[in-house]
Amino acid sequence: MLTPYAYHLVNVFAETYFGGNPLAVFPQADGLTDQQMQLIARQFNLSETVFVHQTTESSAVRKLRIFTPDYELPFAGHPTIGAAFVLHQQLNLPETYLLQTQAGLVKLFHEAKQICFGLQNHIDVEVIDDNLPQYTQLLGLSESDIAQIAWINTGSRQLLIQLTSLNALKTCQIHPALFQQIVKQSALYLWFVEQNQANVRLFFGSNGAVVEDPGTGSAAANLGGLCLKNGLTPLNWRIYQGDEIQRPNRLTLQVDESETIYVGGKVIAVGCGELFVPSGEGEPSQGCR
């Protein structure tokens, strides 16, 4: 037996129709098992696929489960914003509400031209100040290209490396073996900022390869957390990501006096459909109805 599940395709952090970070949203995913959600994420083979369930928190409108093709994430920015875009239309939600993630509750804000999430979580910071040659080899750069190295977690733990020039950001070459050794199942976020514009790149591992992500909200939140710890707030930055892989993403990052981190961007709907999920693994498909 095949059960149809509706999905929506959206581009998050997009300012052009084929820009942004693509996302599949399943707005009614109750009934899917963890294994089925993982297999569906692998089928779509996007950086993440998000599944919406009834919430277990009375203050939240829905619960999100976020999967890469290889594993589940406790939190990720572009799936949260993309799911919010779909749910806001389907459920006629107010301009501000809460969504539940595996990392906790996230507050969403719908503004005139974009959707933002706000975090006020505990920020874990581990600054790396030794073994610099290992990181220069990881990036294929020199020591003078690196300004700061730190592990940050505002919802998803990632390695952030600040670079000293835009050229270093554009020309770095990631060493796959060292990436697997140092970053493992986390992500590497490289950033350079000048005059309130941050240019960034994010890399993650998938099936033994190093893949570049076009737009990453959780890493932008971690960047805000690092700036908060470094005393660089309040701030209002525009983030450029994805240009090196011809998939331009544009994000906003704000940190206010209350130490709340806001990450936002525009969302463009590009498609929808149904996926037929078998009740038993290996059941033959009966095709479209």
UniProtKB/Swiss-Prot annotation:
One of its GO terms (cellular component) is cytoplasm. Its EC number is 5.1.-.-. The keyword Isomerase applies. Gene3D superfamilies: Diaminopimelate Epimerase, Chain A, domain 1. GO terms for biological process: biosynthetic process. The active site is at 48. It holds the Pfam family PhzC-PhzF. It is an enzyme of class 5 (isomerase). Keywords: Isomerase. GO terms for molecular function: isomerase activity. Disulfide bonds: none annotated. Belongs to the PhzF family. This is Uncharacterized isomerase PM1503.
